[in-house]
C-alpha cells in the first residue's frame, strides 16, 4: 500500500515571489451584485474598511455582505509581494498573498470588534496554512487594518480568543494581524466577486470551531 504525503506549505520570500502584472486583473469593477454599492468607492464619510482572510473567500464574502452595517464587500488578495496577481498565481503559493474579503462598514452600526469576532468564530484560526481540505499559504487566517490603533484592538481580540481555544483543546492561534494600505489590496477577477450570489450552489466550506468569541455587540 502506498501512502502519499502533501508537503507542508511554505511562505514564499520576496525574492522568490512572482513578478506580477502591470495592470489590475479587474480593470472595470462593477457595482456589488447584491448590495448595489460600488466595490471600489468612493466611500461615504465615516465609512471604514477592514480586510479579512478566513480561507476560501467565496463564503466569507457572503457571510459579511449579509451583516447589518456592512455597506460593501469585494474579494481579492493581500498580505504578499506580487503586484496585480491573478487567481492562478495566488493558488501557486508563489505570491505570498492570502485570499481576502474587503469589508466596508459603517462604524455607527457595527464595530470592528464585532466584525473580527464574527470572523474568528466562522473558521478555525489554529490551522496555519490551511482551512480544512483547502491547503496553501493563500488560505491563512488574517485581519488587515489601516491604523496601528485598529491593529492593537484586533490583536487583543485574537489573543483572548486564542486562550479560549486552547482551553478547549485547540492548538496555538495562527491568525496574522497587520496594518496595510488600500493599495496593498488587489481585487480578484470578476467571476469571484459575489460568487455565491452568481452560483448559489457553489463551493462554501464551513470550518468553525463552534467556540464563541465573547465579543458583545
UniProtKB/Swiss-Prot annotation:
InterPro entries assigned to the protein according to its UniProt record, in alphabetical order: Met_Sox_Rdtase_MsrA_dom, Met_Sox_Rdtase_MsrA_sf, MsrA_MetSO_reductase
EC numbers, comma separated: 1.8.4.11
GO MF, one example: L-methionine-(S)-S-oxide reductase activity
Keyword Oxidoreductase set for record: yes
NCBIfam families per the UniProt record, alphabetical: msrA
Assigned protein family: Belongs to the MsrA Met sulfoxide reductase family.
Listed name of the protein: Peptide methionine sulfoxide reductase MsrA
Catalytic residues (positions): 56
Organism: Corynebacterium efficiens (strain DSM 44549 / YS-314 / AJ 12310 / JCM 11189 / NBRC 100395)
GO BP terms: cellular response to oxidative stress; protein modification process
Highest taxon listed in the record's lineage: Bacteria
Single GO cellular component term: cytoplasm
Reactions this protein catalyses: L-methionyl-[protein] + [thioredoxin]-disulfide + H2O = L-methionyl-(S)-S-oxide-[protein] + [thioredoxin]-dithiol; [thioredoxin]-disulfide + L-methionine + H2O = L-methionine (S)-S-oxide + [thioredoxin]-dithiol
Function in brief: Has an important function as a repair enzyme for proteins that have been inactivated by oxidation. Catalyzes the reversible oxidation-reduction of methionine sulfoxide in proteins to methionine.
Keyword flag Ligase: no
Record region (Disordered): 16-39
UniProt KW keywords: Oxidoreductase
